[in-house]
UniProtKB/Swiss-Prot annotation:
The gene is obg. HAMAP family: GTPase_Obg. Residues 161-327 form the OBG-type G domain. GTP binds at residues 167-174, 192-196, 213-216, 280-283, 308-310. It comes from Borrelia garinii subsp. bavariensis (strain ATCC BAA-2496 / DSM 23469 / PBi). It is found in: Cytoplasm. InterPro entries: G_OBG, GTP-bd, GTP-bd_Obg/CgtA, GTP1-OBG_CS, GTP1_OBG_dom, GTP1_OBG_dom_sf, OBG_GTPase, P-loop_NTPase. One of its GO terms (biological process) is ribosome biogenesis. An essential GTPase which binds GTP, GDP and possibly (p)ppGpp with moderate affinity, with high nucleotide exchange rates and a fairly low GTP hydrolysis rate. Plays a role in control of the cell cycle, stress response, ribosome biogenesis and in those bacteria that undergo differentiation, in morphogenesis control. Mg(2+) binds at S174, T194. This is GTPase Obg. The keyword GTP-binding applies. Disulfide bonds: none annotated. Its EC number is 3.6.5.-. Residues 2-160 form the Obg domain.
Length: 329
């Protein structure tokens, strides 16, 4: 499949260490006890970790600042302050982490439970009891906590689409991608608006799918005709092919057959993939009649869903079907 790069830049900050405590023991029978100020807690570290079933970087937004917790100050009776909680940032497998300032690759997290401590928290300061000596019996100072560090990082992830939107030019693939995801594919009323694959992430009920909009496939694409040629090979790794056709056209059935023939001519592996047929533009004249003809022609063996992006018809049903098909793998 065509490798789509998901990239996001964020700032991470480790926690400050807590300050050491200045304290002296004061008890009923020991009014002038010695120093007993405890140490400050360490600041939280920032850790990137690979999480199972995480597919994208969609939980992060460009410009976000994410901070670990600060360590707590030391206390009397030589009690240490609590350590700051680590900030654990979950990422999908095969995520690269770069230093945004110098473009250096800091780490590559490839498999489940891989982790990388990108910033350590500041050390806690020493309490005043640590500074007592035979000469300095009552130190009235303690050590401040060490400051945390900050770093601008860029996360990069190469994605493989779950579902490829395939169809002739102007069938409405880009409009569909834009409707069901946050992608911004170019849309216009002329052929070959999409000149490169576009990617979108479809989120539904705490899960997500990666959807790709492939440039329009025309007759002869498998032999080098049109813009879809070099992208046919890139959809061989998708789980599902979503065949999008303009059901308002008089030659809708011919368009569908051309699409199937091009897939078959390119490779049987591609042709034999699980498919769903999307009959788009149900809001236009003759569409309902054509839709019924399509169902009759293809029979019950093919999964066919009629939609209208303009009227938002069938979109919810289509989204649910995408997830049902994807989870069947």
């Amino acid at each position: 499949m065509y490798n789509f790069k998901d990239s996001v830049s964020i700032t991470v900050i480790s926690g400050n260490g807590g300050s050491g405590c200045v304290s002296f023991l004061r008890e009923k029978f020991n009014a002038k006890g010695g120093p007993d100020g405890g140490n400050g807690g360490s600041g939280g570290s920032v850790i990137f970790k690979v999480k199972e079933n995480l597919r994208t970087l969609s939980s992060y937004k460009n410009g976000h600042v994410l901070c670990a917790k600060n360590g707590r100050p030391g206390m009397s009776f030589k009690r240490s302050g609590a350590n700051g909680k680590d900030l654990i940032l979950f990422v999908p497998p095969n995520t690269d982490i770069y230093n945004e300032n110098d473009e250096a690759l800091l780490c590559r997290l490839e498999k489940l439970n891989d982790e990388f401590v990108i910033l350590k928290g500041g050390r806690g300061g020493l309490g005043n009891w640590n500074f007592k000596t035979s000469i300095r019996r009552a130190p009235r100072f303690a050590q401040p906590g060490e400051s945390g560090n900050s770093l601008n990082v860029r996360l990069e992830l190469f994605l493989v689409a779950d579902i490829g939107l395939v169809g002739p030019p102007n069938a409405g693939k880009s409009s569909l991608l834009n409707r069901i995801t946050s992608a911004k594919s170019r849309v216009a009323n002329y052929p070959f608006t999409t000149k490169i694959p576009h990617l979108g992430v479809l989120r539904y009920s705490y899960d997500d799918l990666i959807i790709a909009d492939i440039p329009g496939i025309i007759k002869g694409a498998s032999f080098g005709v049109g813009l879809g040629t070099k992208f046919l090979k890139h959809i061989t790794k998708t789980k599902i092919l979503a065949l999008v056709i303009d059901i308002s056209e008089a030659n809708f059935l011919e368009s569908y057959n051309i699409l199937l023939n091009e897939l078959k001519s390119y490779s049987y592996k591609l042709f034999n993939k699980k498919k769903i047929i999307i009959a788009n533009k149900l809001d236009l004249d003759s569409s309902e009649k054509n839709f019924n003809c399509l169902i009759k022609a293809l029979g019950k063996e093919e999964k066919i869903i009629g939609i209208s992006i303009y009227e938002n018809r069938g979109i919810d049903e289509l989204i649910k079907e995408f997830f049902i098909l994807a989870k069947a793998f």
